[in-house]
C-alpha cells in the first residue's frame, strides 16, 4: 500500500522517537526527505543523518539530538499537505515563534528555511514548522 503523505510520516516518526528518547530513527528515503534532514541538521535540530541502502531499498537514518535529557525539537508539524497545499510568496512566508523556530519551505531553488527564502527572494510551498 502506498503512503499518501511521506513527509508527514517522516515528521511523525521523528516526533514519536523523541517522545520515547530513541537515539536514532529510520525512515524510507527520498530526495525531499534528505533535503529536510539537511535543513534540520544545519539548524541544529538533529545531530546528523545517513542514507543507507539495503537490498534495493534506501533508508534515511536520522540521529536525534537531546539537551539535558529533553528533545531539542519541541514542536514539529506539517503545514502543506496533499489535501491542502500551502504556497507563500517571499514576503508572506510566516515566522515561527517570532523567529525562534523555522519554517521549512520548498522553492524552485531547493528546500530551505524561511529566513533563507526571504533573503533569497523566493517563495514556495511551506512544508512544516519546527520549534
UniProtKB/Swiss-Prot annotation:
GO-annotated molecular function: rRNA binding; structural constituent of ribosome
Cited SUPFAM superfamilies: Ribosomal protein S8
Domain of life: Bacteria
GO CC annotation terms, alphabetical: ribonucleoprotein complex; ribosome
BP GO terms, sorted: translation
Alphabetical UniProt keywords: Ribonucleoprotein, Ribosomal protein, RNA-binding, rRNA-binding
One family name in Pfam for this protein: Ribosomal_S8
Cited HAMAP family: Ribosomal_uS8_B (MF_01302_B)
Role this protein plays: One of the primary rRNA binding proteins, it binds directly to 16S rRNA central domain where it helps coordinate assembly of the platform of the 30S subunit.
PANTHER family xref list: 40S RIBOSOMAL PROTEIN S15A
Family: Belongs to the universal ribosomal protein uS8 family.
Complexes and interactors: Part of the 30S ribosomal subunit. Contacts proteins S5 and S12.
Name under which the protein is recorded: Small ribosomal subunit protein uS8
Source species of the chain: Acidovorax ebreus (strain TPSY) (Diaphorobacter sp. (strain TPSY))
Amino acid at each position: 500500500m502506498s503512503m499518501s503523505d511521506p513527509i508527514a510520516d517522516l515528521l511523525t516518526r521523528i516526533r514519536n522517537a523523541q517522545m520515547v528518547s530513541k537515539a536514532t530513527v529510520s525512515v524510507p528515503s527520498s530526495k525531499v526527505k534528505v533535503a529536510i534532514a539537511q535543513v534540520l541538521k544545519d539548524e541544529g535540530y538533529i545531530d546528523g543523518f545517513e542514507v543507507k541502502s539495503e537490498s534495493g531499498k534506501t533508508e534515511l537514518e536520522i540521529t536525534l539530538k537531546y539537551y539535558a535529557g529533553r528533545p531539542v525539537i519541541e514542536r514539529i508539524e506539517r503545514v502543506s499537505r496533499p489535501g491542502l497545499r500551502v504556497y507563500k510568496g517571499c514576503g508572506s512566508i510566516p515566522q515561527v515563534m517570532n523567529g525562534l523556530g523555522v519554517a521549512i519551505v520548498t522553492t524552485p531553488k531547493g528546500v530551505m528555511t524561511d529566513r533563507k527564502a526571504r533573503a533569497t527572494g523566493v517563495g514556495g510551498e511551506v512544508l512544516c514548522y519546527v520549534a
